Amino acid sequence: MAKRGYKLQEFLAHSANVNCLSIGKKTSRLFITGGDDYKVNLWAIGKPTSLMSLCGHTSAVDSVAFDSAEVLVLAGASSGVIKLWDVEEAKMVRAFTGHRSNCSAVEFHPFGEFLASGSSDANLKIWDIRKKGCIQTYKGHSRGISTIRFTPDGRWVVSGGLDNVVKVWDLTAGKLLHEFKFHEGPIRSLDFHPLEFLLATGSADRTVKFWDLETFELIGSTRPEATGVRSIKFHPDGRTLFCGLDDSLKVYSWEPVVCHDGVDMGWSTLGDLCISEGKLLGCSYYQNSVGIWVSDISQIEPYGIGSADKKECVEKILSALDDQSFDRIKSTPRRSSSPDYETKEIKNIYIDSTGGNSAVAHKSGSLSTPATSTGQAGDNKSLVVHSVVPRDSDIGKDSSDSGKESITFSKTKPGMLLRPAYVRKTPTKFDETKKQSVAVGYLKKSGLDGEKKLDTETAFDSEMSGRNPYDADDSIIKSITNKFEQALLPESPTDEAKCMLLKPPRVQRSPSTKYNEARWATSTDSGALDSKKNGLESSRDMDLPTGLRDDRGSNPCEEDIENKSISSRSERVLSPEKAGDELKSLESPGGSKESKSVKVVRGVKVVSGRTRSLVERFERGEKITHSEDKAASATVVHSSNSVEEEPLTASVQTVSMMPTQVMPVKLDQATNSTTVDVPVLSTRRTKSTPVRVMPVVLGRDTSMATDTPPVTSTRPDRTSATNLTSDVSGVTSKRQTRTSPAPVMPMILNQTTKMKSDEPSITSTWPDRTSATDLTSDVSGVISSRQTRTSPAPVMPMKLNQKTKIKSDEPPITSTRPDRPSATNLTSDESPVTSTRQAKTSPAPVTPVILNQRQTTNMKSDEPPVISTRPLRTSSARVMPVILNQASTTYDERPLSSSRSARTSPARIMPMKLNQADNMPSYEPPVALTRSARNSPARVIPVKLNQATNVTADASHIRSRQRFSPTQTLATPAVFDQVTDMTLDETTKTQQSSDILTQKEEPQISGREDDGDIWEILMRTHSEVLNTLQSRLTKLQIVRHFWERSDIKGAIAALRKLSDHSVQADVINILTDKTEILTLDLFSQLAPVLTGLLGSKTERPVNVSLEMLLKLVAVFGTVIQSTVSARRVVGVDLHAEERLQICQSCSAELQKVQKILPLLTRRGGLIARKAQELNLVLQTP
C-alpha cells in the first residue's frame, strides 16, 4: 500500500529564520517565503533553488501573499511597511506605509485592484493599488490580526485576531457586519466553502468551527484535537475540509461534522495547504528550512479506493431502479454559487423547502441523471449513514472504519451546547435501503428479526469498512436486490403508519441570528434509539401532514417511517418554539406521550425545568408564598367595591411599651399647615444610642392637613401622661431623672392612623407571627399585628420656619406608669422637643410612606385585595410603601393600642422636608404591630414626595437637605449645589456609623424570611431597573449611531443633550483611551459634559471626568492659555479667530471646574487625590 503522507523535499530557504509562507492557488506549483533576512524568495515545488529573490525591505518579513494570477507578490514587514512586486518583471511596484506595528497578515482582493493588511496594532487597512494609498481602516480587534481572507465575490473581508475573535467587515458599507466569539484561542486560518455561503475557522484552541454567513450562526464545531490548528482548506467539491494540525492531518465533513480520517505527517510549523490533481500539498518551515509534504487524497477517507469500488457495485445494483429513483426526486438542485448580496431576504441554504418527498442534491455536482446522483452518494459514503451508526452498536464495532466519529455537538464554552450538524435527506432507493439496513442491524441486536437481517447488516459492514467488491458474497448483493424489489412492491400501510403523520422528518433551523438562543440537540446514544419509536408518535415538532403518499399511491410502510426517524434521530435540530416537546421525548426513556409545557413569561417561551431566568424565579417565589398562605389563620380580605372604616385596636399587653417613632418634618418659607394638635408620648431609658435620621422629601405645593389620633400606651412600673397642644409650637417633655434633647419634631405619625381610602386592602399573614395589613384610607393604611411585642407609632415632628401656621384639633395622648408619674401640658412657640430614653435599645421597624404630588391614586374598584404569606420568623418589620397624591383628603380616626415586652428599642427619627408653600395632608397608615420577645433592627425605607412622578424612593437617592450658602455665587450654580450637598453628605457618614455599630450589637435573626424580603424588594424595583437599563441602552445606541459614521462631534453633541451621567461616563471612559482622536474643537464640546459630571451623586462619573480632564489639560492646557493670553493681531485671520473662540470657551469651562475642585477635595479618597492633582495643573502658569 502506498504511503498516505510523506515528505517530498526539504531545503534551506533563507539565511535567517523563515517567518511566513504562501502557496500560489492558480497552478499550485509556486510558493513564496519571507524571512528575517529581509528577503522574499520565490520557489517552484520540486526544485531546491529559488527562482527569484525579491529585495527591498529593511526589516524582517512577517507576511506574504500571492494574487489570484500568481503575478503579483505582496509582503509585509515588521516595520509596518508593505511592498508589492511584479514577478514577471521582477521589480517592486508599490510601497505602502501606515501601520504603526509589524504587518502580520496580507491578502489580495479577488479582483486584484485592492489589498488588505492586518497589523499587531489591531488595525485592518484596505489599500488601493492604483491610488497608492489607504482607503479604509477598520478598528475593532483588541489585539493583533493574524489572518485575513476576502469572500469569493469580494464584497466582504474577514479577519481573525489574537483576541480569539473573527470579524466580518462589509467593504461596501465600510462597517463591521458581525463577529464570532466562540473560539477560545487565537485564530490561525480561515477558508470559505467553494459552493456554499459558509466559513470555516481554525484556531489554536484545537477546534475548527463552521459558520453560516447568511444567518451568522455557528452550525458546527469539531471536538478539540490533541494539537492546535495551523491551516485549513476545503476540498474543491466542498464535501470535506482538510485540517492541518501541528503534527498531523485531519479530514472533516461539515454536514454533519464527522472526522473521516487522520494522517500523521510529521511536519513542523505548517504554513499553507493546497489541493491539486488529487494531491494535498503542505508547506512547513522550521528555523531557516522549508519542507514540502504530500498526501494522496485517494488513500484518505472518504476518498479512498474502497469508496470507488463500492460505487461501481452500487451502480450495478441500482441500474434497474433509475426511473423510480428519478421520479421520486422532486426538489430543485442545491445552489452551487455564491449568494446574491443585493437581495435583502435571507435565504436559508440548509433547509429544503420543497413539497412532497424532499430530496437535496449533493454539493459536488448537479443531478443530471439518477445514476450520477447515486454514484456520488456511493462515493460520499452517504454522510447521513455515518451519523446514524451508533458508535456503541455492533455495526460500528464490526466496521473496519470504526475510527470515524459522529460529532453532533461540542462545547465551546462551559454550559453551551453547539447545534448539531444539518442533515440532508437523500431520496434515492440506495440511501433508503442503507437506512433500512441500519434499522435491521439494530433490531437484530434486540432479537426481533432473523437471518435476513444478518445478511443486510453484513452488506452494510462491507460498505462501511471500505472492502473491495470481490470481498462481498453474491448472497449479499442478492439480499440488497431483494430488498429493493420488496421496496418497490405496493404495501398496505400498517396500523402505526396510519396513525402517524407521514412526512419525512426535515431539518429545521431557527430563523434567529443569535446563536445563544434556546437550541437543543439530540445525542447519538444507541441506547436511546429504541425509545425514539414511542416518543416519535407524540412528537409535534415533526410537522408531518397526514395523507402524504409516495409515488406508488400507497402510504409508506411503518418500517420506512421508523428507519427515517432513526436516521434523523441524532441530527435533528429543534427550533426554540418546539424544544420542549422534543426534550420531553428524549429525556424520558419510556417515550412519554406528554410533552413538556412551554409557558410564556413576558413574551419569552420558557421550558419548565430548563430555563432559570430571573423572571421565572420571581414567579416561582410568588407561587410559594401564595401556597403558604393557605396555612395562615388570620387574614383580612376586603372587597374591591367597598371600603370598611372601623377603628382597629390591637391587643394591649401589660408589659413594656416601645417609644414612639419620631419623624421630623422641616417646613421652609411660606408653609401653610393645618393641624398638628399632637399629643406625643416619648418614653426612653436613660442611656440611649443616637437615633438615626431617615429623610422624607416632599415636593412643592403639597397640601398638608393632619388629624392625629390619640396614642395610648400602658407600661407597668412607669407612667407618664403627656398632653401636647401646639399652635406653631414645638414640644417639650418633662421627666424626673435624665432628659436628652431631641430634634425639633412637632408632627406625629401614628401607626394606628385610620384613613379613608378607595384602595383595596392588603393582608399579609405569618404563621405564629401574623401581621394583618388593612388599607382603608385614600392612600393606604397598614395594620400589622404580631405576638407579644409591638412597635410604637412613628412620630413625625415638624420644624416650623417663617410664616408657618399649624392648627391642631387632636385630643391629648395619655400614658400611664404606676411608679413614676409625670404629667406635662405644653403650649409653646417653636420650642424644642425633649424625649426620655432608656438604656440599650434597638431601632424599631418602620413602615415608610411614599408620597407623590401630582398623580391621583384610586384603586377602589380596579385592584383586588392582595394576600401574601410569610415564613415563621421575621427579623424586620415589613416595609409597605404607600402612595400619596395631592388630591387625597385624609381623616385619622383610629386609635393605637400597642404593647411591647421586655427589651425595647428607640425609634428612628425620620426627618421630613417640605419646600415652599407646602400644605401636606396626613398620611399616617393605621398600624398595629405585635412582635415576639426578641426584636432585631428593622429595615427602613424613607418617604419621598416627588412633584410629577410616582416613583418608589430609595434611601440612597433621597436628598434630605438643602445646605448651601445663598451668598455663594458660581457660574454653574446647579453643579455647585450638587457638589455641596454631596460634600455635606460625606460629613454625616461618621454620625451614621455609630448607629450601624449599635445595630450590629443587636441579635440578628436570619432565615427564609430574609430571602423573602429580598425577593419582595427585587420584585418591587425590577421593572424600574429594567426601564432604566433600557433607557441607557437607547441612549448609548444614539451615540453609537454617530460614532459608526465617524462623527465624533455629533456623538459628543448628542451626549450633551442626553443628560444622563451614567451614559456620559460610559462614553467618556471609552474616549479616555482614545485621546488621540480628540481635537481642541472636540475638547470645547466635551468640556461642559465633564463639568456636569463633577456634580454626579456617584463616584464613578466624577472619577471619569477628573481623569479625562487631567489628560486633556495636559495636552491642550498650554495651547489654551497661550491663545487666550496672546495679544490681538491687526488684520483678519479667520482661523485664528475661530481658534480664539474655542480656547475662550475651554478656558471658561476650566475656570468653572477650578471652583468646584475645593469641594471635591473634601470628599476624600481617590476623588480628592485627583481633584488636588487637577487643581495644581490648572494653577500652574
Curated annotation (Swiss-Prot):
Instruction: Please list which residues make up the signal peptide.
Output: none
GO CC annotation: what is one? cytoplasm
Q: Does the keyword Cytoplasm apply?
A: yes
Subcellular location, in the record's words? Answer: Cytoplasm, Cytoskeleton
List the GO molecular function terms.
microtubule binding
Q: Where is this motif: DWD box?
A: 114-130
Keyword Cell inner membrane attached: no
Primary site of residence: cytoplasm
Q: Where are the WD repeats?
A: 13-53, 56-95, 98-137, 140-181, 183-221, 224-264, 266-303
State the Gene Ontology BP annotations: microtubule severing; regulation of unidimensional cell growth; response to abscisic acid; response to salt stress
Ranges for region Disordered: 361-383, 503-597, 702-739, 754-869, 988-1008
Where in the sequence does UniProt note compositional bias of the Basic and acidic residues kind? 530-553, 569-585, 998-1008
The tissues where this chain's protein is expressed are given as: Expressed at low levels in siliques, flowers, leaves, stems and roots.
* Swiss-Prot/TrEMBL keywords: Cytoplasm, Cytoskeleton, Microtubule, Repeat, WD repeat
Q: Record's InterPro entries?
A: G-protein_beta_WD-40_rep, Katanin_C-terminal, KTNB1, WD40/YVTN_repeat-like_dom_sf, WD40_repeat_CS, WD40_repeat_dom_sf, WD40_rpt
Q: Which CDD domains match?
A: WD40
Q: What does this protein do?
A: May participate in a complex which severs microtubules in an ATP-dependent manner. Microtubule severing may promote rapid reorganization of cellular microtubule arrays. Confers precision to microtubule (MT) severing by specific targeting of KTN1 to MT cleavage sites such as crossover or branching nucleation sites. Together with other KTN80s, regulates cell elongation by modulating MT organization. Negative regulator of abscisic acid (ABA) responses. May function as a substrate receptor for cullin-RING ubiquitin ligase 4 complexes (CRL4), a family of E3 ligases involved in protein degradation.
Assembly, per entry = Component of KTN80-KTN1 complexes composed of a hexamer of KTN1-KTN80 heterodimers that sense microtubule (MT) geometry to confer precise MT severing. Interacts directly with AAA1/KTN1. Interacts with subunits of the CUL4-based E3 ligase complex DDB1A and DDB1B.
What family, per the record?
Answer: Belongs to the WD repeat KATNB1 family.
**Protein name per the record:** Katanin p80 WD40 repeat-containing subunit B1 homolog KTN80.2
